Amino acid sequence: MKKMSARQQQILDFIKDEVRAKGYPPSVREIGEAVGLASSSTVHGHLDRLEKRGLIRRDKTKPRAIEILTDDMPTMEEQESVMYVPVIGKVTAGTPITAIENVEEHFPLPAHIVGSDNVYMLSVSGDSMINAGILDGDRVLVRQQSTADNGEIVVAMTEEGEATVKRIYKEASKVRLQPENDELEAMYFDNVSILGKVIGVYRTIH
């Protein structure tokens, strides 16, 4: 068999480093960024060749499902403790914007944290929820449900078809969406649709 190329070795080493550091393999996009390949098809080609060499094994029905076939790496069964949560659109936690109802990617999280298949993540921009510890650029973990108690943080769709992250309060004749920022005022609506309850926040420290 032809000798493994330097680029293939670079990709293999990067996958190993990511699995050791994070407990799960990188995405195709992350591999490309790490080794300087802009084309995802080129990355897939290198992964195919690594798989033919018996160095990795992939489950193409699942995102990021790459197993390194060496004794010092976690097996695919051990990696099954990770759940791949869909990241859906982008919700503004300041001025609401129309929600984009498509899955942008799948994000790996420990299964014991997620606890349910009925969850998704949303990226947040704006500072209206800073007092609740939700900052600009965070991703919120949301459990899909159509009801919530007063004071809970939810993803709510307004009458105008816009989505926002706020605390919800059902008052006598209106629904109040309350920001967690002393400089911002509450928003009032006749009706809103609850798209889910926020159960966690993910933040990357740069």
From Swiss-Prot:
Recorded catalytic activity of this chain's protein: Hydrolysis of Ala-|-Gly bond in repressor LexA
Listed Gene3D superfamilies: Umud Fragment, subunit A, Winged helix-like DNA-binding domain superfamily/Winged helix DNA-binding domain
Keyword field contains NAD: no
Name of the protein this chain belongs to: LexA repressor
Signal peptide, first to last residue: none
DNA-binding region: 28-48
Pfam families from the UniProt entry: LexA_DNA_bind, Peptidase_S24
Membership in a protein family: Belongs to the peptidase S24 family.
Summary of subunit composition and partner proteins: Homodimer.
The encoding gene: lexA
Record's keyword terms, sorted: Autocatalytic cleavage, DNA damage, DNA repair, DNA replication, DNA-binding, Hydrolase, Repressor, SOS response, Transcription, Transcription regulation
InterPro entries documented for this protein: ArsR-like_HTH, LexA, LexA-like, LexA/Signal_pep-like_sf, LexA_DNA-bd_dom, LexA_repressor, Peptidase_S24_LexA, Peptidase_S24_S26A/B/C
Organism whose genome encodes this protein: Exiguobacterium sp. (strain ATCC BAA-1283 / AT1b)
GO BP of this protein: DNA repair; DNA replication; negative regulation of DNA-templated transcription; proteolysis; SOS response
Active site: S128, K166
Top-level division of the source organism's lineage: Bacteria
EC number: 3.4.21.88
